[in-house]
């Protein structure tokens, strides 16, 4: 049985520039995940369920667990002195860690994705993304360090808190998964070099918003529902409402996750930096594809910390199909 810590150290040789800092950074994220796992499991007992009464910068009501997870993960990263600063879905601006100007890395994170599901005991997750800073080491980080395209990511991953807690990550050399053993307090390797199945037959989308979708997406959904033995349709519809949980299932079983633009969110709803980029990096490393319907997600140049984007991620052939429908049926 190989632990996450042992695996990270073993793989450190894959980076010619490695000095151990990235290893320590991933270890800090691992610690934060353990703390969040522990408290999610007793959330109903310690009054951290439900809305906090506050709103984030996007105007969304923050759940108590959103704020709790944000603070715990931020503290775990700050304690190691190896991160120069963070950007979080729950923070209006970047957080600069004083005294860490020497650090080479910055972290972007969605501390608790799908937190509105926690009250009904549905799987939620943590998403993280790591970049090497672009401003000079020895100076405080600036927003420039965080507004990098996804193809500059050094590492990315997620933790899914479900029937078991799993941490899945990539450093650009494949996707690896670890299951948390609470009796030992360690993450143990369960799948190395994960890949999307060759063919997917599941589509994940909130069809309650169907009337608001672009024409090309509507046509694709109808295509998924049509019967055709040659392409193994109709596809199965599965939607949890938690990006991490939906992506994880599709990674294992094969499928596509869709979150298109709507009239109320013409640019899309998911955050490019905190959700789309890290999941796109993982998808490509697992042999899949991620797009906004027209452009590769990892090539998009961010313009703001909380920028949103349409998001289609999963099996190559399925993402290509939805891109073709969007191109063939443009909205007027």
From Swiss-Prot:
InterPro entries assigned to the protein according to its UniProt record, in alphabetical order: FBPase_C_dom, FBPase_class-1, FBPase_N, FBPtase, Fructose_bisphosphatase_AS
* Places the protein is found: Cytoplasm
Residues engaged in binding Mg(2+) 1: 89, 110, 112
Residues reported in the UniProt entry to bind Mg(2+) 2: 110, 113, 275
The entry marks the following residues as binding substrate, namely: 113-116, 206, 239, 257-259, 269
**Which free-text remark accompanies the cofactor?**
Binds 2 magnesium ions per subunit.
Name one process (GO BP) from the record.
Answer: gluconeogenesis
Cofactor field = Mg(2+)
Top-level class of the enzyme under EC nomenclature = hydrolase
Q: Which reaction does it catalyse?
A: beta-D-fructose 1,6-bisphosphate + H2O = beta-D-fructose 6-phosphate + phosphate
Q: Does the keyword Cytoplasm apply?
A: yes
Q: What are the entry keywords?
A: Carbohydrate metabolism, Cytoplasm, Hydrolase, Magnesium, Metal-binding
- What GO cellular component entries does it have? cytosol
Under which pathway is this protein filed?
Carbohydrate biosynthesis; gluconeogenesis
Highest taxon listed in the record's lineage: Bacteria
Question: What Enzyme Commission number(s) apply to this enzyme?
Answer: 3.1.3.11
As one GO molecular function, the record gives: magnesium ion binding
Query: What protein family is recorded?
Result: Belongs to the FBPase class 1 family.
Q: Which HAMAP family match?
A: FBPase_class1
The record describes its quaternary structure and partners as: Homotetramer.
**What protein name is recorded for this chain?**
Fructose-1,6-bisphosphatase class 1
* Classification lineage: Bacteria, Pseudomonadati, Pseudomonadota, Gammaproteobacteria, Enterobacterales
